[in-house]
Amino acid sequence: MNAQVGATASHRENPHHSRWTFGCACHSSRRQFLAGAAAFGATAVLPDKKAKAQPAAPKLIDTHHHFYPPAYQRRQIDWEDQRKVPHFGVQSAWNPDGDLEAMDKNGISTSMLSLASTPGVWFDDGAENAHDMARLCCDFAAEMVRDKSGRYGLFAPLSMLDTDATLKEIEYAFDTLKADGINLQTNYGDKWLGHPSYRPVLEELNRRKAVIFVHPLVANCCANLSVGTFPAVIEVPHDTTRTVVSLLLSGTFAKLRDISWLFSHGGGTIPFLAGRIEAFYDQKARGPNGFAPDGIEAEFRRLYYDTANATHPAAMAALTKLVPTSQITYGTDYPYFPLDQIENLRKLGLPPADLAAIANGNMTRLIPRLSA
């Protein structure tokens, strides 16, 4: 990420999303920003022209790949301008043609589309509007999936503000749009995914044997704990850990066994903190009525983790000590990070079978249609 990227706090009435929006350190006016968006996108969104295409084998499936419909981009610019929050250029300059060109240049066969942005689909304008924005984003991504056969899959974003409306969103995503899975945030305001209010939604997703991709946002509680850094550097991976622990301690993992969970950025800090969490809770967790019947580490080993911005040798060493490579998928966090992170994995000297499993095999096992 560009070293000039910064973050600005903004006052919000909405209790269901983070207090922070991230952007470049220099705040541009709406007119200046829109005038320069296309030029910015050409340099920031697309990869270096000197980058070489990746080899065809192994096939690459990017499981952590973001999209932003034009209507969403415009709404976010308005929302940020109202709060004097700087714009995040690569997000607002994203477009489908540039996305596909970048995939081609970097050997990405298929990308799983998901939404990742503060404030999600709720722009402080009511649950109904959030529901409508979720529908708009799902429709846009589903059209990309249809128009570019085989190049995209869809993790459908949900609003999560009203249980009945969210259940209808799930029905529409799976039954009408044929989504491949669901895209959730780690937190919605001051509630993480293990909160009891989300149990009816998760029970329905369990009934459908859904794949859930979970993307972190900086939580309300912790936006001011960044010790002078861009908040995403520290707080984003920690919020993945918070929501994983909330799902663990609430018994959600133990009770809803038919959900396949995919967590971002190598699981945040879970690989490093697994032993500490186990030391505090493992004895009370075990047993047929416990929240981790076979032990906490066994619960963590059932989850899936992507490699987005987590391909450093130390990070991968921790992750592969905790889980087998069968639980790891390739991800990039594009357009915020480059698409060529497979090179870092190649340098680790993984056995070819393990590299192929991460690159595509594990994801095609989760979503068989991607093997076509």
Model regions: which residues?
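Mid-to-C-terminal alpha-helical segments outside catalytic/metal-binding sites
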Residues: 2-48, 56-59, 63, 69-110, ...
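Active-site gating/metal-coordination segments in enzymes
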Residues: 109, 114-250
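Active-site gating loops and adjacent loop-to-helix segments of metal-dependent hydrolytic enzymes
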Residues: 69-94, 123-131, 219-240, 277-302
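Active-site environment of divalent metal-dependent phosphoester hydrolases
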Residues: 68-70, 119-121, 161-162, 190, ...
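Generic enzyme active-site microenvironment
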Residues: 213, 263, 331
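Active-site-adjacent C-terminal substructures of enzyme catalytic domains
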Residues: 237-241, 254-258, 282-283, 288-339
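Histidine-centered divalent metal-coordination motifs
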Residues: 64-66, 215, 265
